[in-house]
Amino acid sequence: MAINESFIGELQHEAATTRKVLERIPAETFDWKPHEKSMSMHRLATHVADMFGWYAPTLEQDELDFANGYEEPKPANTEELVALLDKNVAAAIKCLQKTDDAAFMQNWTLRNGEQIYFTMPKAAVVRSFVMNHIVHHRGQLSVYLRLNDIPVPAIYGPSADEPEM
């Protein structure tokens, strides 16, 4: 199996689960956050949906420099949030489909100007900086749902709200 085929399968599975989480977020909870230092529900959900758009910059470029700036999308409602996810997932699949095994072994660097945070093979970046990062923040988002009495979907197993998978 080619590396891209493995990543596509995982991406599709995680995207479907993420979609279930995002679809449950009512716009009236967008400003809510559990602590003053925490991201708002809207900011965290947008970050999760937006990270599915990180495949192309990771696989088609050799670095990301925060010094160049980045403007995250600002979906106005739940439908736009889910549409952002769907758009990014479709683009990620297209990008993965055209990426060969050799490209996954090329190094990629995350930096902020002269400060280098890390350099690692693109396959490792996709796994850790993109996919594991998405899963981490989706987990936080599921706690946000619980704290707002919004039913939490089954993710890797049953939840208290969805005991059947």
Q: Which residues make up each language-model segment?
A:
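His/Met- and acidic-residue-enriched segments that coordinate or traffic transition-metal cofactors
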Residues: 24-25
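Helix-adjacent hinge/juxtasegments
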Residues: 57, 62-101
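Acidic catalytic patch
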Residues: 98-113
